């Protein structure tokens, strides 16, 4: 069917719902095609057909009709139709299978010029296969060996094969079919890896975002242009690291050539990669060097290349790399004797081997930076959520990695079955010892030795006072931050006075407040009564949503464009008014077609009109008055003697985006609503209803109009009917939506685009935003974590005495703490409507974190910790950048790790609002013997000697707000 078109016979709402319902439950199958639809359009369709049982209000009403499928909100560039970055499933788009898409397309059509967004289902995981739709394709940089400066970008699915890429490159670079070619993966400066296994997929090959691929055509004499380089490099010293002596050769070979900047000499470094043979993966596990042998780098100061949104992984890895007990364990090869390849919960030792390989490279002292390609590939095989190239969470990666390393290195070969016992009034020390011993019977690894501690959890039934005490192991502490209570919003106020421009305001409202709170705050600044305000989300020149006063502000996203309109419920004479949404539309004739297309433009209006004066003439005059600031009226003789006809479109069944006879059924039912006594609605297709009206009202002069009106759906994309100019009252209500239809020439002559978009800034916008110095101490977060709370009604506890679920009180306490204490600051919060990041500065001590007072075990050892690493997150939730601060275990100095860049840091840089995950090392740990304990502090990043162990920290934690 034609693009943009919909079928003439659309099923009723119930049929649409029954046909699409089962299709939306389709299981993902590898290789299947699914389509993206803007969630705003899809939600409108669901309302229209009553798809959700809890939202059956006004099902099938014409004003809810969604019109053609419109995905414009998903594009960062409407021309190229490139997807915006960081789109979120269900929030920004929905995924529908092919059959569902075809039905929707047949019923509604698609906005003219838009191409369907179709994506493949790919499979992830090694043991547990997991299918997901690959929303974001991988961008690869392609070039020919003879001209590396001519780089072309192309997108591929992870399911595409190397052969597919080679075929595409041969076509792009016009390489004759009879000429042999080889494909090379260029990475890390001037290192090349041949991709010789053509049936491998992009995912199998470990290709990443922005990877450069080079195609090499064979010379006419049968030799290869790169052959000379390869033969030369074969004599260079090898620096290959393999994961196992038993590893088989990889299908990839690599060769590198580097120019040494300091001096005239040149050096080549030839490397033959080895792959991990187990599992038949065939992955290359080597990390090619780029530094000359003569250059010495401080071990551990090795950057990690960003493989495409992998800064989250790099940040977590740098923190773990600078955790001395764990790193020494791998550098001394102690892991080799403890790999558990038979653990069903493990990963056959492959995660441990990949991590060991990377750590050895990072601490070799030879590399300024490496690309952790194969480590990421291995992680993606076992944890599909990390297999793509979208931004992830460093703490989530850290949690997976610690758990994966634990299971791969678990010394327990056969886990015994253990029955959990209740405390039953026994002393805490007895129950805690029993819980820890049981934990160690099933879990015994370097991760448990280093990172595991013990919680005490106490539940009390509010009815029978039953006390339940349990002790549970933990690997890291997730500490809540005190929630901010307010939210700053920027909105536009559109006054009722047509001569006043809209004004932008900045208001502070309760974080969990209602729309009425926004109106009250705006009223205090503007002087306009809150009851005369209507709050709307404007999107693509239309109202996406008009809010009720009692709706929560958490329905409003930070990215939404919020306009607040001043309206009147009664007119000056006290009569009742109706408030109507009115859109601007421009009619555009299609080439070689008698039909016309329309496009919304400008800011929509909310117009209050007295009900007893609601005729077409008064409506036209009210709109003209309302837009008089940026629309000039034509002079009486400006159009000569003929009436102004802005396109034969108003009410035409050819009127909207290919919607031929789009709303026939709605036109029929809508006619009863437009006027008390309306003439025949049987307008001939293609005729302007204004002409029809003129024929009806003989003897009346034809008015000169800038635009005509159409009754449309809430999207403004489908016409329902024309408005009668018979002088009778129009039967319109607040759920009716109108469109002003302009022709292109009239818009050009009379519509002032610049003035229509002009607005003023209130003083609240001009003044520097006063940000509260939201600073809390780490102590506050720990106290909040250990505070007693009452369980919510949706998260009750089953009381064994009462035999029912109860909203018990719950309290966490710390019983024992590990050698390495990992503290996760819970900065991200989200619900169905709201996603936010807390930028609170948490002051944490660099040295002397005394946790003893928070440990409820009175006989416990002292717990005093010093900071060794911090994972930072800059930016908002779902976007931004991760870095790390870490203290080198050899020289005791602090360094800043930003992907491949490593720089010296000082202590006063570390405590910022970006701090996300903290790593602390216990002072009595045998590994903790660094120069920092004896060296004096200096500006070069050295640390000062600790002064005491009194209080929460030896020294006052510094804070720096990076606003």
UniProtKB/Swiss-Prot annotation:
It holds the Pfam family UCH. Residues 225-243 have a biased composition (Polar residues). The completion of the deubiquitinase reaction is mediated by the DUSP and ubiquitin-like 1 domains which promotes the release of ubiquitin from the catalytic site enabling subsequent reactions to occur. Residues 11-122 form the DUSP domain. GO terms for cellular component: cytoplasm; cytosol; lysosome; nucleus. Residues 384-386 are annotated as: Regulates ubiquitin dissociation. SUPFAM superfamilies: Cysteine proteinases, DUSP-like. A motif (Nuclear localization signal) lies at residues 767-772. Residues 302-923 form the USP domain. Residues 459-463 are annotated as: Necessary for interaction with RB1 and RBL2. One of its GO terms (molecular function) is identical protein binding. Changing residue 386 to G: Lowers affinity for ubiquitin characterized by a 10-fold increase in ubiquitin release and a slight reduction in ubiquitin binding. Overexpressed in small cell tumors and adenocarcinomas of the lung compared to wild-type lung (at protein level). Expressed in the hippocampal neurons. Changing residue 51 to D: Moderate reduction in thiol-dependent deubiquitinase activity. Residues 1-17 have a biased composition (Basic and acidic residues). It comes from the Eukaryota. Changing residue 311 to A: Loss of thiol-dependent deubiquitinase activity. Its ubiquitination by TRIM21 is enhanced. Does affect interaction with HAS2. Does not deubiquitinate HAS2. Deubiquitinating enzyme that removes conjugated ubiquitin from target proteins. Deubiquitinates PDPK1. Deubiquitinates TRIM21. Deubiquitinates receptor ADORA2A which increases the amount of functional receptor at the cell surface. Deubiquitinates HAS2. Deubiquitinates RHEB in response to EGF signaling, promoting mTORC1 signaling. May regulate mRNA splicing through deubiquitination of the U4 spliceosomal protein PRPF3. This may prevent its recognition by the U5 component PRPF8 thereby destabilizing interactions within the U4/U6.U5 snRNP. The DUSP and ubiquitin-like 1 domains promote ubiquitin release and thus enhance USB4 catalytic activity. However, these domains do not bind ubiquitin. This is Ubiquitin carboxyl-terminal hydrolase 4. The lineage of its organism: Eukaryota, Metazoa, Chordata, Craniata, Vertebrata. The gene is USP4.
């Amino acid at each position: 069917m034609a693009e943009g078109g919909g079928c003439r016979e659309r099923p009723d709402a119930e049929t649409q719902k029954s046909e699409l319902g089962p299709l939306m439950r389709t299981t993902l199958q590898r290789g299947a095609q699914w389509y993206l639809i803007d969630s705003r359009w899809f939600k409108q369709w669901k309302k229209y057909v009553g798809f959700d049982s809890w939202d059956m209000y006004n099902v099938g009403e014409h004003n809810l009709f969604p019109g053609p499928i419109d995905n414009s909100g998903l594009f960062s560039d409407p021309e190229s139709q490139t997807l915006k970055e960081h789109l979120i499933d269900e929030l920004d788009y929905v995924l529908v299978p092919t059959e569902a898409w075809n039905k929707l397309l047949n019923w509604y059509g698609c906005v003219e010029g838009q191409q369907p967004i179709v994506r493949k289902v790919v499979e992830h995981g090694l043991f547990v296969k997991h299918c997901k739709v690959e929303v974001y394709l991988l961008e690869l940089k392609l070039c020919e060996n003879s001209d590396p400066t001519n780089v072309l970008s192309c997108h591929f699915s992870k399911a595409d094969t190397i052969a597919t890429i080679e075929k595409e490159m041969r076509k792009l670079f016009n390489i004759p079919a009879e000429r042999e070619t080889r494909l090379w993966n260029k990475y890390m400066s001037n290192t090349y890896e041949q991709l010789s296994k053509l049936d491998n997929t992009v995912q199998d090959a470990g290709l990443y975002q922005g990877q450069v691929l080079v195609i090499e055509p064979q010379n006419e004499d049968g030799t290869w242009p790169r052959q000379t380089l390869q033969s030369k490099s074969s004599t260079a010293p090898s620096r290959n690291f393999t994961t196992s002596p038993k590893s088989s050769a990889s299908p990839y070979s690599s060769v590198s050539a580097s120019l040494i900047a300091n001096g005239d000499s040149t050096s080549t470094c030839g490397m033959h990669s080895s792959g991990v043979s187990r599992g038949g993966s065939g992955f290359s596990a080597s990390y090619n060097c780029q530094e000359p042998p003569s250059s010495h780098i401080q071990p551990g100061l090795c950057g990690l290349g960003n493989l495409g949104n992998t800064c989250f992984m790099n940040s977590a890895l740098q923190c773990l790399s600078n955790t001395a007990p764990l790193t020494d364990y791998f550098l001394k090869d102690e892991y080799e004797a403890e790999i558990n390849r038979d653990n069903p919960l493990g990963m056959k030792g492959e995660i441990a081997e990949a991590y060991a390989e990377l750590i050895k490279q990072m601490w070799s002292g030879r590399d300024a930076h490496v690309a952790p390609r194969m480590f990421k590939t291995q992680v993606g095989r076992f944890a599909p959520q990390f297999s793509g190239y979208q931004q992830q969470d460093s703490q989530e990666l850290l949690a997976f990695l610690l758990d994966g390393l634990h299971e791969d290195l678990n010394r327990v070969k056969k886990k015994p079955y253990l029955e959990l016992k209740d405390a039953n009034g026994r002393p805490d020390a007895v129950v805690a010892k029993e819980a820890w011993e049981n934990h160690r019977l099933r879990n015994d690894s370097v991760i448990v030795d280093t990172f595991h501690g013990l919680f005490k959890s106490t539940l009390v039934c509010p009815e029978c006072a039953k006390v339940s005490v349990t002790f549970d192991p933990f690997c890291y502490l997730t500490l809540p931050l005190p929630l901010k209570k307010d939210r700053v919003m920027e909105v536009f106020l559109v006054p009722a006075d047509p001569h006043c421009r809209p004004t932008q305001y900045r208001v502070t409202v309760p974080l969990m407040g209602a729309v009425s709170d926004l109106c009250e705050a705006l009223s205090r600044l503007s002087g306009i009564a809150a009851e005369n305000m209507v709050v709307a989300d404007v999107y693509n020149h239309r109202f996406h949503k008009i809010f009720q006063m009692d709706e929560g502000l958490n329905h409003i996203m930070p990215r939404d464009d919020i306009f607040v309109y001043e309206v009147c419920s009664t007119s000056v004479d006290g009569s009742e008014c109706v408030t109507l949404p009115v859109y601007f539309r421009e009619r555009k004739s299609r080439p070689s077609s008698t039909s016309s297309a329309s496009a919304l433009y400008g800011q929509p209006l909310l117009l209050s009109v007295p009900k007893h004066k609601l005729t077409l003439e008064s409506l036209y005059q009210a709109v003209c008055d309302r837009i008089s600031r940026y629309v000039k009226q034509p002079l009486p003789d400006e159009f000569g003697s003929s009436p102004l006809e802005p396109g034969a479109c108003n009410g035409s069944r050819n009127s909207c985006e290919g919607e031929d006879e789009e709303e026939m059924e709605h036109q029929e039912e809508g006619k009863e609503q437009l006027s008390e006594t309306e003439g025949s609605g049987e307008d001939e297709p293609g005729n302007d209803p204004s002409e029809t009206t003129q024929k009806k009202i003989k003897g009346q002069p034809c008015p000169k109009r800038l635009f005509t009106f159409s009754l449309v759906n809430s999207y403004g994309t489908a016409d329902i009917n024309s408005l009668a100019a018979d002088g009778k009252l129009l039967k319109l209500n607040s759920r009716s939506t109108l469109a002003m239809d302009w022709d292109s020439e009239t818009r050009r002559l009379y519509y002032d685009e610049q003035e229509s978009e002009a607005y003023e800034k209130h003083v609240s916008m001009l003044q520097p935003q006063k940000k509260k110095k939201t600073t809390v101490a780490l102590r506050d977060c720990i106290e909040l974590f250990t505070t007693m709370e009452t369980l919510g009604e949706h998260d009750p506890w089953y009381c064994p005495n009462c035999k029912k679920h109860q909203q018990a009180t719950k309290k966490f306490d710390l019983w024992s703490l590990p050698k390495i204490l990992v503290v996760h600051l819970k900065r991200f919060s989200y619900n169905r409507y709201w996603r936010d990041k807390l930028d609170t500065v948490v002051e944490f001590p660099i040295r002397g974190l005394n946790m003893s007072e928070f440990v409820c075990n009175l006989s416990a050892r002292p717990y005093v910790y010093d900071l060794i690493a911090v994972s930072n997150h800059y930016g908002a939730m779902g976007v931004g950048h991760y870095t790390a601060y870490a203290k080198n275990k050899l020289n005791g100095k602090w360094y800043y790790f930003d992907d491949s860049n490593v720089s010296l840091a000082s202590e006063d840089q570390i405590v910022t609002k970006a701090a996300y995950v903290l790593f602390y090392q216990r002072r009595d740990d045998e590994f903790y013997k660094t120069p920092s304990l004896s060296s004096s502090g200096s500006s070069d990043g050295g640390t000062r000697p600790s002064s005491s162990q009194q209080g929460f920290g030896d020294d006052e934690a510094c804070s720096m707000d990076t606003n």
